Curated annotation (Swiss-Prot):
Coiled coil: none annotated. Belongs to the RNR ribonuclease family. RNase II subfamily. The gene is rnb. The keyword RNA-binding applies. This is Exoribonuclease 2.
Length: 644
């Protein structure tokens, strides 16, 4: 009777269109209920039965119900699922398998089965890659996943590495392939094998891609030749090895080991500038005036060199600081170290006066046992030898940026535009409240940015610096020359790490075209997109492995009185994030640990402060003492507590 009633259909349509709806992202809680977050201000309650239809992170459209002045959301339509491809731990066995996603807010096991053709018999505790196949909001009865890749067994000591690489879909090993002979590139190579080139690296480094030679000139000037390993002498553009390097884009450096961009035979041997081995290089000869200015007679050329010594950062630093018992093996090498230290001093002063110098942060190194256990984590401060290499590389990259810009008009450039113009007024207003007056227009120029950075560096603490960081734009990779505000330079193009950065290989090929006087093809913009994406994934992988190892390292400190100095790096509504000064671990201090009475506590991300009873008790960049309250291995999170 009512089946085809057009009035009824119209009424249903009307009711549907009049029912309020909202689109947002599902946020799960540990208590079974959840929230639909529409924006920063508005969220709706999702009752536990309705949460069964969705997953934390899903973007959905929901119907909004109002009962007794309480609004709740009923999920109706899936816009974008949170989980598509993911890693997790397998539960059950044989024909009844489920997988728990490796994510702090996803606790429920998802029924699953192995994909066809995947011949691994999954067991309880195995790690796997899975892909979602069913979702209740897509008309399916329940969630369902398919196991697409076996990662490793549950007790594997190297789980942090294998799981992280699988999560980000990154390669686990060096690329295959060999290069048997050098290409005929039509380059005339200068024979510099008689010169006392040296490399300075960590003791364990095998892929040495830069060697340095310095010479004093009669008029108080200094000459520097930077010689860089030459993988493009072996790898033709468009070849199989080139395509593999293009996809990887970078060598992936993880705690404990690296996954090279090039086959190890090339990265650690044929291209590596080993001591007492003749190697082809691409080189840059520059003259530095007394104040460290790079003069205009920059020269790029192909050469062969023979490094005369593999020097180690700490030994060189000790010797220059008159400590330790290491001595250069000859007076010629000693003279090189002295001259390179002079160049470092001059270039450091030039950058301090005319560009920007980063504050030195220590590097943290994990010392691992054979089974991946963390024996120690050591902070390695950046010392004089590190700065020698850094100044030489920055100078060489400035030279490449100039030559590529003037001769070709393109290359692979690192570009950083400073502050986002949309933030300029807010930035000026914030600085004004702290007594610094800047012009919103001027601060968007390179000179204005440098001026502000110098003022911030002169502040007694880094608090204000941390406040304005959110107004900065991100560094980008571009085929167009452009300024690098972060370094305070008009243009910056790297070519000094071609064994581990594909962009540097591209710049090598472009510089070789300049040397030969040939025309060159502008790199396609897609390559910069791939490089930016790979850089992001590699950084996330390094962070994820690090989090896992930090959790392992600090697990036995949980609940003890062991104190750690910790710098506050971020404050949010829920508490504070801190970095342990001695080892670099990130820990979280929940708000209740800061003060028991919630109403008397204000944690402000906006101001970077924690106020208790209206008084500022903590602020970002403060260093405080903490103990480790808890280490949660399943989420690799470290919970700390301030020492009262």
């Amino acid at each position: 009777m009512f089946q085809d009633n057009p009035l009824l259909a119209q009424l249903k349509q009307q009711l549907h269109s009049q029912t309020p709806r909202a689109e947002g992202v599902v946020k799960a809680t540990e208590k079974g209920f959840g929230f639909l977050e529409v924006d920063a201000q508005k969220s709706y309650f999702i009752p536990p039965p309705q949460m069964k239809k969705v997953m934390h992170g899903d973007r959905i459209i929901a119907v909004i119900h109002s009962e007794k002045e309480r609004e709740s959301a009923e999920p109706e339509e899936l816009v974008e699922p949170f989980l598509t491809r993911f890693v997790g731990k397998v539960q059950g066995k044989n024909d009844r398998l489920a997988i728990v996603p490796d994510h702090p807010l996803l606790k429920d096991a998802i029924p699953c089965r192995a994909a066809r053709g995947l011949n691994h018999e999954f067991k309880e505790g195995d790690w796997a890659v899975a892909e979602m196949r069913r979702h209740p909001l897509k008309g399916d009865r329940s969630f369902y996943a398919e196991l697409t890749q076996y990662i490793t067994f549950g007790d594997d000591h190297f789980v942090p590495w294998w799981v992280t690489l699988a999560r980000h879909n990154l390669e686990k090993e060096a690329p295959d392939g060999v290069a048997t002979e050098m290409l005929d590139e039509g380059l005339v190579r200068e024979d510099l094998t008689a010169l006392d080139f040296v490399t300075i690296d960590s003791a364990s480094t095998e892929d040495m891609d830069d060697a340095l030679f310095a010479k004093a000139l009669p008029d108080g000037k200094l000459q520097l030749i930077v010689a860089i390993a030459d993988p493009t002498a072996w790898i033709a553009e468009g070849s199989k090895l080139d395509k593999a390097a293009k996809i990887r884009a970078f060598t992936n450096y993880l705690p404990g080991f690296n996954i090279p961009m090039l086959p190890r035979e090339l990265s650690d041997d044929l291209c590596s500038l080993r001591a007492n081995e003749v190697r082809p290089v691409l080189a840059c000869r520059m003259t530095l005036s007394a104040d460290g200015t790079i003069e205009d007679n920059i020269e790029f050329f192909a050469a062969t060199i023979e490094s005369k010594a593999k020097l180690v950062y700490d030994q060189v630093s000790d010797w220059l600081e008159n400590t330790g018992d290491w001595q250069p093996e000859s007076e010629a090498i000693a003279e090189q170290v002295r001259l390179l230290a002079q160049i470092c001093q001059r270039r450091g002063e030039w950058r301090h006066n005319h560009a920007l110098v980063f504050k030195d942060r220590p590097d943290y190194r994990f010392i691992l046992g054979e089974k991946g256990e963390v024996l120690d984590i050591v902070a390695e401060p950046r010392r004089i030898a590190n700065r020698i290499v850094e100044e030489a590389m920055i100078a060489a990259n400035i030279c490449a940026a100039r030559v590529l810009r003037d001769k070709l008009g393109f290359g692979i450039y690192n570009v950083h535009m400073g502050f986002d113009p949309a933030n300029a007024d807010a930035l000026a207003a914030l600085l004004k409240t702290h007594g610094l007056h800047v012009d919103a227009e001027e601060v968007l120029t390179l000179d204005g940015f440098c001026k502000l950075r110098r003022e911030l560096d002169a502040q007694p603490t880094g608090f204000l610096d941390s406040r304005i960081r959110r107004f900065q734009s991100f560094a980008e990779i571009s085929t167009e020359p452009g300024p690098h505000f972060g370094l305070g330079l008009e243009a910056y193009a790297t070519w000094t790490s071609p064994i581990r950065k594909y962009g540097d290989m591209i710049n090598h090929r472009l510089l070789k075209a300049v040397i030969k006087g040939e025309t060159a093809t502008r790199p396609q913009d897609e390559i910069t997109v791939q490089m930016a994406e790979r850089r992001r994934l590699n950084r996330m992988a390094e962070r994820d492995v690090g989090d896992w190892l930090y959790a392992r390292f600090l697990k036995d400190k949980a609940g003890t009185d062991t104190r750690f100095a910790a710098e506050i790096v971020d404050i949010s509504r829920g508490g504070m994030r801190v970095r342990l000064v001695d080892n670099g671990a990130i820990a979280f201090i929940p708000a209740p640990f800061l003060h028991a009475v919630r109403d008397e506590l204000v944690c402000s991300q906006e101001n970077g402060t924690v106020q208790i009873k209206g008084e500022t008790a903590y602020k970002v960049t403060d260093v405080i003492d903490v103990t480790i309250a808890e280490v949660r291995m399943e989420t690799r999170s470290i919970i700390a507590r301030p020492v009262a």
